[in-house]
Amino acid sequence: MKPAAREARLPPRSPGLRWALPLLLLLLRLGQILCAGGTPSPIPDPSVATVATGENGITQISSTAESFHKQNGTGTPQVETNTSEDGESSGANDSLRTPEQGSNGTDGASQKTPSSTGPSPVFDIKAVSISPTNVILTWKSNDTAASEYKYVVKHKMENEKTITVVHQPWCNITGLRPATSYVFSITPGIGNETWGDPRVIKVITEPIPVSDLRVALTGVRKAALSWSNGNGTASCRVLLESIGSHEELTQDSRLQVNISGLKPGVQYNINPYLLQSNKTKGDPLGTEGGLDASNTERSRAGSPTAPVHDESLVGPVDPSSGQQSRDTEVLLVGLEPGTRYNATVYSQAANGTEGQPQAIEFRTNAIQVFDVTAVNISATSLTLIWKVSDNESSSNYTYKIHVAGETDSSNLNVSEPRAVIPGLRSSTFYNITVCPVLGDIEGTPGFLQVHTPPVPVSDFRVTVVSTTEIGLAWSSHDAESFQMHITQEGAGNSRVEITTNQSIIIGGLFPGTKYCFEIVPKGPNGTEGASRTVCNRTVPSAVFDIHVVYVTTTEMWLDWKSPDGASEYVYHLVIESKHGSNHTSTYDKAITLQGLIPGTLYNITISPEVDHVWGDPNSTAQYTRPSNVSNIDVSTNTTAATLSWQNFDDASPTYSYCLLIEKAGNSSNATQVVTDIGITDATVTELIPGSSYTVEIFAQVGDGIKSLEPGRKSFCTDPASMASFDCEVVPKEPALVLKWTCPPGANAGFELEVSSGAWNNATHLESCSSENGTEYRTEVTYLNFSTSYNISITTVSCGKMAAPTRNTCTTGITDPPPPDGSPNITSVSHNSVKVKFSGFEASHGPIKAYAVILTTGEAGHPSADVLKYTYEDFKKGASDTYVTYLIRTEEKGRSQSLSEVLKYEIDVGNESTTLGYYNGKLEPLGSYRACVAGFTNITFHPQNKGLIDGAESYVSFSRYSDAVSLPQDPGVICGAVFGCIFGALVIVTVGGFIFWRKKRKDAKNNEVSFSQIKPKKSKLIRVENFEAYFKKQQADSNCGFAEEYEDLKLVGISQPKYAAELAENRGKNRYNNVLPYDISRVKLSVQTHSTDDYINANYMPGYHSKKDFIATQGPLPNTLKDFWRMVWEKNVYAIIMLTKCVEQGRTKCEEYWPSKQAQDYGDITVAMTSEIVLPEWTIRDFTVKNIQTSESHPLRQFHFTSWPDHGVPDTTDLLINFRYLVRDYMKQSPPESPILVHCSAGVGRTGTFIAIDRLIYQIENENTVDVYGIVYDLRMHRPLMVQTEDQYVFLNQCVLDIVRSQKDSKVDLIYQNTTAMTIYENLAPVTTFGKTNGYIA
């Protein structure tokens, strides 16, 4: 039970009820007294009331006193008596009467004297008071001694209880259970042993009164009663009465009715006025009309009636408690509105015994209008709906409606609970009253206050649209503000914007998205007018990040991005090219364009669109790929390949081509060449000879858009010929050792061909590597001695053969074959003999000399040891064998028959001397034998008086001749004189011959050692002392430097210049007084004329080598070929040019290099590959190629353009930095390569540059300075080097600035020289030579 139920209070009683109840109770008590039969009793006799229930379930209220007695609102308990001692009743409805009891149940008045056997039994046993837990019994006894009796009262239930009563005829029995049937026995006794017969009475205790009686619900025509039942309560009866005076209650509304048979735990729906309508007119209230509730009960499990507005349930049973409730609920329906009622509830036992009553008052609700609601409110009308508290009779009501506005009011009557109120004003406050009327009675009215909303806006429109904003505007005259609901299509929620203006910009939108804008005008008190809606899409976002995923010659795959969820976008593409335009569309963010033209630029514009709303366009440009090249043709030489190809696209004139040249086996170092636009051929240089290459040619257009696949071609460069090879003889072997440096590049071997006359032999040699300058060596055997062979070696690679390298080599020599015979010796005089012999066979080499050997000893086989003995040794007796004569000869190879024709006769003893051997007179009468030694190689021992070194010479001996004996001397004096004269003549002749040969040999000397022209003077100064030295020499206007320079003027001028002065060479000199010394001039190879070796150039000593530099004049038109021939033959990699071609209107140097196209200078092709023009100098790169051998190498020209025409550079740092630039480049060149330096004459500026280079090295390596000595050395190799005093001072200034920069760590070296003088002047022609050459001043 809910707490609210416990707090329920009975409704207050009306004044009429308060005075009526005591009168009613008095009447009921009088009736009880009358029904008792008039018999007095010492204890009040309680009445017994019986409530009977008929079979039809309707409770009947008995009108007879015998069946129903009223006593204080309670019924008399039912009592039964019996003589049985065990107290059992003979029947539930039987009364056991004693003999003295009358027929009407009254007790008799007779008395009886107790017999001797014991007391008489009691009689007239009554239960004068019955409550739920106790019973008061009374009884009678006619014995005279009854006052002395004691009585034993017993009852048997679970436990028997005995009560002894002494000297009184009544007993109060307590501790009983409610609504329980008890049998009490009463036994009288005297003393402790004499007992009378017992008498019994059956009594049922009252049930417990109901509790927690409450009104659980009240309505207009209904009320719900609820109470709790105690244990033993079988059912309940309700007495329901309307309360009020006759004036307050009409005949129809007056009610008094009993409702019986209400069982615990059951819900009932009962209409008490049904009985009221069927009762007999004029019957007293409360005695007629009753209702048995058994037919109205319904299960508690059923759904309760739904309450209406003014109903309230109190304490419903909790069905989840798990216990069956004993509460009873009665719903009374059909009551009168606004009426007071009193309900009295009696608990009943199973036999109808009722407990004490419980009463409660309540009032039904009056008729009322409630929940007045305005619906369909517009600016000019609204619809009212409401409810009434009396739903059952609502159709009988009419309603008065009063509408009061701010300035007007109106009334309206309707017959149903709804009404339409027209003619209202917008944005106006109204008070509305609805009053129910039933007949003449008005119920409680309902009230409503309402504001009419403003008029809907007009001209609601979109003013501006962007990707994230939409502007809106409208018109309104009565709204205070406006509420805008923004709903995105496809989204469930919406956002709200509030504004007091009549326009708004809605931001934060998504591009390309449809939005609906519902505007609601807001009036007073938050009223809202009818909405207006407009829908519009934002502008789609422009696409971005357009990406060409893949492109071919005819297709292009594009994708792009959009910054929003653009699933509904349509993308329109415009594809434009020089061939026209095309349009297409797609729903995807990618598309493949087909049918395109190769190598064509397409401009693609993409515009997003959704629902005919177009976004901003975005575009990209892309070339389709060119088609692949075809028909590749390759022509090669050793280091270059010229390629040509074809492409048949219409756009091919706009193509360039990218060539990737990859050497086989070296894919990581591919060479790339890109042609100019429209060029379909290219020459690739700096390739490796004899190597296999693969070229891939991509056509490309625009910004490097290449063809999908390259055209491929494999080729091999021509193998490089070897520069030369050397032949070495094998001592005393008929073989040749061939040596050469492996040619550059790769090779598969060499073809060696050796021939001599008709004999020919070819051999394949293994390959070699050109890395690290590897020398190749092979030996050719089984040749003939001293034979000339034509040898050809051809490099082979990739199935190609290089140009053969040829040489003529002669095999070596060995000891000549000894002759078969012996010399013929005959006596000429007493001291001389004649020896005749034939020449040795020269098949082992040309015979270079013969030696005549005499011996006085035995004839044996001579050995090489005898060659060391002379006539003097013979005379001293050191040896009996000696060499007496030596013949030098040059016999070529010949056959044996020819050698026999060649005869030699030697006079021995003529006292001649040949190469240290004295042909002295023989002893008269002496016996001599002779043999001849033939030499193919004769070697003299320098430490043994220049005599023949037999061990080192190639010699063989003839056999000794027969001995010859000399006669006696006929004239010693004549012979001696003759011998002396003859010996002197021989010596003079031989000496003159030797002198003549030596002079001839010196005239043909090709090169003079530089050791002969070492500087003879030097002024070596330490670096730390140079600044003081400079200041000293600089004093008095450079007086000290002037004296030094004066001392240098005559250095070297006396050296011969024969080659330069030859008539054939005079025209090759730019200036007639600047001629190269013969001792150091550069000689070129002789081609068709002996003077072809001349060029006006000299080797110049540098710091590291005597040939570090070549100083030359600026080329003339007729010496351009010679100039480039010198560059090639002397392996020049760098040219230093220190003049402009034209200075002050005079030609100083011919422009000897090509500017655009490659140009041939005789056998040399020169092509410029790059040119960098800077303010102080220009750097040009060339490729120099020998047309005959196809060999080439790079060449860089450093053209210094900041040397004034008459003077020196403005600052020393320019020339010093220029020098370092040159030296950095030379680190990449071969170390033996000289630097070619020239100006106009090749002496002044050229000498200054060379001197600076040497001075910097000297300072860095020796910490000393020798300006004077270096200039002296240069002038010993070429005249006029460092030509002017200004240049000499400038050299010293450069040294000073270098020394200072090292000391101060300065970078910029600044030196100003304001003096100048004439350097090179062409004077009037000299008629002596008939040439235009002048002299240099």
UniProtKB/Swiss-Prot annotation:
Record's keyword terms, sorted: Angiogenesis, Cell junction, Cell membrane, Cell projection, Glycoprotein, Hydrolase, Membrane, Phosphoprotein, Protein phosphatase, Repeat, Secreted, Signal, Transmembrane, Transmembrane helix
Residue intervals passing through the bilayer: 976-996
Residues annotated to bind substrate: D1205, C1239, S1240, A1241, G1242, V1243, G1244, R1245, Q1283
Main location: membrane
InterPro entries xref list: FN3_dom, FN3_sf, Ig-like_fold, Prot-tyrosine_phosphatase-like, PTP_cat, PTPRJ_TM, RTP_Phos/Ushers, Tyr_Pase_AS
Alphabetized GO MF terms: beta-catenin binding; cadherin binding; delta-catenin binding; gamma-catenin binding; mitogen-activated protein kinase binding; phosphatase activity; platelet-derived growth factor receptor binding; protein kinase binding
Effect in UniProt of substituting R214C: In a colon cancer sample; somatic mutation
Sugar-bearing residue positions: 72, 82, 93, 104, 142, 172, 192, 231, 258, 278, 342, 351, 376, 391, 396, 413, 431, 501, 525, 536, 582, 603, 618, 628, 637, 666, 669, 761, 772, 784, 790, 824, 910, 937
Enzyme class: hydrolase
Residue ranges with Polar residues bias: 67-82, 89-119
CDD domains from the UniProt entry: FN3 (cd00063), R-PTPc-J (cd14615)
GO annotation, biological process: angiogenesis; axon guidance; B cell differentiation; blood coagulation; contact inhibition; cytokine-mediated signaling pathway; glucose homeostasis; heart development
Cytoplasmic-side positions: 997-1337
Keyword Transmembrane in annotation: yes
EC number of this enzyme: 3.1.3.48
Effect of C1239S: Catalytically inactive and substrate trapping with higher affinity for substrate
Annotated ranges, domain Tyrosine-protein phosphatase: 1041-1298
Name listed for the protein in its UniProt record: Receptor-type tyrosine-protein phosphatase eta
Species name: Homo sapiens
Lineage summary: Eukaryota, Metazoa, Chordata, Craniata, Vertebrata
